[in-house]
Amino acid sequence: MNSFLKRVVCATAVAASALALAACGDDEGESSEPTPSSAESTELTPVKLQLQWFTQAQFAGYFAAVDQGFYEDAGLDVEILEGGTDIVPQTQLAQGRADYAIAWVPKALQSREQGAGITDVGQVFQRSGTLQVSFKDKDITTAADLKGKKVGNWGFGNEFELFAGMTKAGIDPGKDVTLVQQQFDMQALLKGDIDAAQAMIYNEYAQVLEAKNPDTGELYKPEDFNRIDWNEEGTAMLQDAIWANTEKLESDKAYQDQTVKFLEASFRGWIYCRDNAEKCRDIVVAKGSKLGASHQLWQMNEINKLIWPSENGIGIVDEAAWDQTVQVAMETKNAEGATVITKAPEGLAYTNDYAEKAVAALEADGVDPNGADFEPIEVQLEAGGA
């Protein structure tokens, strides 16, 4: 029995020399094609998933879905394509080099406005993971406190929550702060070159906690820093989502069915990581993560906090969060005066249809897609994230 697809395979001996396998009806009594677990369906459908960065626990759910056989149970042979500084995942998807892609919502919406035919079918991250981090003695606790400071940001479309937060606080980002192009690390903050640094709570923030405090010889502690959380400031934008090919969603029945299967298997991977953080850390490390085991466990724990609880079910787009993301993307200008998008998204920018079917299948199988009782674990970081 393949509980993933909610089917039952019935075996009937029809002759002494042959064994015929027929797929019985599903729970609703409807007939269906044989499942991937039947003897008649041994071939898996190849699927390519494009990540937006290098292998790390940010993507643990997908690696877990491969490792635990969830994709295979769904009849899918999923190849995970690593990202990097020169790879735009939504472009890879739009150009047919991948079947699905992981991308932040505002960046993907910008690509849509430029012509990419992509749709958000699974909003995995329910909350933003972006922070602005400063040493405690700088007394920067809100966006308003950034006035007159040297403020680091990565640019490349990552800066809009920061700019929206400053604008909301009455700060002109072009005049009231000194903007500093920040590398994707925390060295400028640790060296004192900037007063506040952009950081992901699951990555760069951990890096400062993995560094030694020269005054004590011990690792820095959370109480050594202040953090501005854009979720609390009201300018957060939706981040990691699963994007699919819009044209295929609208015209290709096989792709539509595949998308439900892919989402359900991916969600199972994330649920597995919710309940087995250490095991998912091990999966990611074994896949060749650039940073070490303690860093990946921290990252796994923080990623879980961004996903769980999922009030409406994992992958379901929250309309209020979507609307806030679109508003910030349309109205907030960066240092060059540009916005992420110039108008509200048109067409099928997102749909909950496929995620809702995947969540319903999980619930029917007794799997919790909400994680209302999720509790994070305690993580002890080591020097350098070892």
Short names for language-model regions:
Residues 33-182, 186-191, 195-201, 222, ...:
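Short, glycine-/small- and polar/acidic-enriched structural segments
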Residues 25-28:
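Bacterial signal peptide processing site
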Residues 106, 138, 184-187, 194-290:
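Pocket-lining segment of extracytoplasmic ligand-binding domains
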Residues 1-11:
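Bacterial N-terminal signal peptides that target proteins for export
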Residues 323-386:
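Conserved C-terminal helix/tail region of periplasmic/extracytoplasmic solute-binding proteins
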Residues 19-23:
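C-terminal motif of bacterial Sec signal peptides marking the signal peptidase cleavage site
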Residues 252-338:
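Secondary-structure end/capping motifs
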Residues 10-18:
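Hydrophobic helical h-region of N-terminal Sec-dependent signal peptides
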